[in-house]
């Protein structure tokens, strides 16, 4: 089902040089379309672009079930003299021009048979301006009465902001009701007819009178619809939400039926009413003819008892034939198919239409049902259902994205912590005991002592590595710590001696100088002998 908002709007020019000019168009968003006509955004109409800016939105008509009906309404409003539904009435608007002419055509169009069956809403955005135009129209054409609200036509004065929040923003279901609330009208009256006309079965069908019972019944019906276990009241086949029609007195009436089933019921009731009217008129005609015949015969004195009895007998036979033919005119025969009498009656009635045009009583509570109101309620529920499903889908997607983002944040935080524990950060100064233990073994101490002795004697520390076969750990401080660190870096001779003598705590300055001289002294005899 098409759940878009279809409307036909009326614009008028605010330019003093174009006073009274109007524009009629179709759209699904009249507020956005008005901005296009005024040039605020692109894709405006060529006719409104040439002259007339700025334009003002006077009113719009909504409630169309699909775009084809709305486009037909727009064409009839734009070309009333070519429309078969208005061209016979356009003589009333002779001498009326510009904006009052457009408003007068709207008055006639909303009363046309085709659109009077639909449940439409007239939204008036500029009540003062429209009031002046209607007053001017009434002064020129008094034969056209002003529009009044009916059971199918709704007239409301509304601002553009309120209109957007109710019909265009998707927050509500098109008539101000919340999308996630109960779709029943809790304060609905038990009946729109007087109590004297209401049959007893209507009272018996009102089982849910408290608000708790109404919501409980709504939840139960919703569960049955979701499980495809809610039957149609006319054919007993399961219904599919939200594509079914219901009585206007829901939940006080339990009628829920398929669209085609209720349309057949409307057609059947229309034919029954037509047959009853035709039968009554036939009886009246025959009884009038018979009474006139008897009166004429009694005045002439020529009618005898035998002729009068024979005529009475023929009249009774004709009445019996008519009643028997009417009793045989049920929709379904014993085999469940449409009877031949109904087929011939449907074929012989040219005024029957596919869509019901007359109100019909509810098969359960006798409440008058308007076909346009039923279809409007069906579309409203379809819009609510669609928006509710979109809202649930959006919430699920947002929840899934939030969960995934949280999972990514947790994993990245854990990874950073593990990396921080695995290796130090760049530029961080290493402690002396980071790679070596705090204590040095006995073998390590002996190797360090031998190495120090060789250094003091002027020997190379890298010539003999047997002393460092044991894995030693650097002490936290002192000479041994420096010796271990120097051996790992592979620094030789003079550097070892210099740093060793500088960092030694027990050596004097004289000993340090002697060590340096021994290492740097050049022996010429040894060099020549070599």
From Swiss-Prot:
Localization per Swiss-Prot or TrEMBL: Nucleus
Keywords, comma-separated and alphabetical: DNA damage, DNA recombination, DNA repair, Endonuclease, Hydrolase, Metal-binding, Nuclease, Nucleus, Zinc, Zinc-finger
Signal peptide location: none
Stretches with biased composition (Basic and acidic residues): 283-298
Nuclease keyword on record: yes
Region: Disordered, residue numbers: 276-306, 410-438, 474-502
Annotated ranges, domain GIY-YIG: 4-89
GO MF terms held by the record: 5'-flap endonuclease activity; zinc ion binding
CDD domains associated with the record: GIY-YIG_SLX1
InterPro entries xrefs: GIY-YIG_endonuc (IPR000305), GIY-YIG_endonuc_sf (IPR035901), Slx1 (IPR027520), SLX1_endonuclease (IPR050381)
Disulfide bonds: none
Transmembrane is among the record's keywords: no
GO cellular component: Slx1-Slx4 complex
ZnF endpoints (SLX1-type): 232-365
Cofactor: a divalent metal cation
Predominant cellular place of this UniProt entry's protein: nucleus
Gene3D superfamilies for the chain: GIY-YIG endonuclease (3.40.1440.10)
Taxonomy, superkingdom: Eukaryota
Quaternary state and interactors: Forms a heterodimer with a member of the SLX4 family.
Function: Catalytic subunit of a heterodimeric structure-specific endonuclease that resolves DNA secondary structures generated during DNA repair and recombination. Has endonuclease activity towards branched DNA substrates, introducing single-strand cuts in duplex DNA close to junctions with ss-DNA.
Homology family: Belongs to the SLX1 family.
Protein name: Structure-specific endonuclease subunit SLX1 homolog 2
Organism: Trypanosoma cruzi (strain CL Brener)
Lineage: Eukaryota, Discoba, Euglenozoa, Kinetoplastea, Metakinetoplastina
């Amino acid at each position: 089902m098409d759940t878009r908002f279809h409307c036909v709007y009326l614009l008028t020019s605010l330019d003093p040089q174009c006073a009274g000019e109007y524009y009629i168009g179709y759209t699904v968003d009249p507020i956005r379309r008005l901005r296009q006509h005024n040039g605020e955004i692109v894709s405006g109409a060529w006719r409104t672009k040439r002259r007339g800016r700025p334009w003002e939105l006077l009113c719009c008509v909504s409630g169309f079930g699909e775009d084809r009906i709305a486009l037909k309404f727009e064409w009839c409003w734009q070309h009333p003299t070519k429309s078969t539904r208005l061209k016979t009435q356009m003589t009333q608007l002779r001498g009326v021009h510009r904006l009052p002419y457009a408003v007068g055509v709207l008055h006639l169009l909303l009363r046309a048979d085709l659109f009077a069956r639909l449940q439409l809403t007239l939204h008036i955005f500029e009540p003062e301006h429209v009031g002046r135009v209607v007053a001017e129209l009434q002064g020129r054409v008094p034969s056209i009465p002003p529009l009044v609200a009916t059971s199918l036509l709704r007239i409301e004065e509304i601002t553009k902001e309120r209109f957007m929040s109710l019909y265009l923003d998707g927050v509500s279901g098109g008539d101000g009701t919340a999308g996630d609330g109960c779709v029943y009208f809790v304060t609905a009256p038990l009946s729109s007819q007087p109590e004297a006309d209401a049959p007893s079965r209507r009272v018996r069908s009102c089982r849910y009178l408290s608000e708790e019972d109404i919501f409980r019944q709504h939840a139960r019906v919703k569960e049955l619809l979701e499980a495809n276990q809610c039957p149609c009241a006319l054919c007993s086949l399961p219904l599919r939400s939200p594509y079914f029609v219901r009585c206007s007195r829901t939940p006080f009436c339990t009628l829920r039926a398929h669209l085609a089933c209720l349309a057949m019921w409307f057609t059947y009731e229309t034919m029954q009413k037509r047959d009853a009217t035709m039968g009554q008129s036939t009886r009246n005609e025959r009884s009038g003819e018979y009474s006139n015949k008897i009166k004429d015969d009694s005045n002439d004195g020529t009618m005898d008892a035998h002729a009068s009895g024979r005529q009475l007998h023929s009249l009774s036979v004709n009445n019996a034939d008519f009643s028997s033919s009417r009793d045989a005119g049920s929709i379904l025969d014993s085999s469940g198919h449409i009877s031949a009498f109904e087929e011939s009656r449907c074929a012989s009635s040219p005024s029957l239409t596919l869509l019901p045009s007359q109100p019909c009583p509810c098969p359960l509570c006798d409440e008058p049902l308007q076909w346009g109101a039923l279809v409007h309620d069906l579309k409203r529920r379809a819009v609510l259902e669609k928006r509710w499903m979109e809202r649930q889908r959006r919430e699920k997607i947002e929840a899934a994205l939030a969960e995934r983002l949280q999972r990514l944040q947790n994993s990245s935080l854990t990874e950073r912590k593990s990396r921080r524990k695995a290796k130090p950060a760049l530029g961080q100064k290493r402690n002396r005991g980071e790679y070596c233990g705090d204590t040095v073994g006995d073998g390590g101490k002996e190797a360090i002592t031998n190495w120090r002795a060789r250094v003091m004697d002027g020997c190379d520390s890298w010539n003999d590595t047997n002393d460092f076969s044991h894995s030693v750990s650097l002490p936290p401080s002192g000479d041994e710590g420096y010796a271990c660190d120097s051996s790992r870096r592979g620094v030789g001779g003079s550097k070892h001696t210099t740093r060793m003598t500088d960092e030694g705590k027990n050596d004097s300055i004289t000993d340090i100088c002697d060590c340096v001289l021994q290492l740097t002294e050049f022996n010429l005899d040894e060099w020549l002998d070599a």
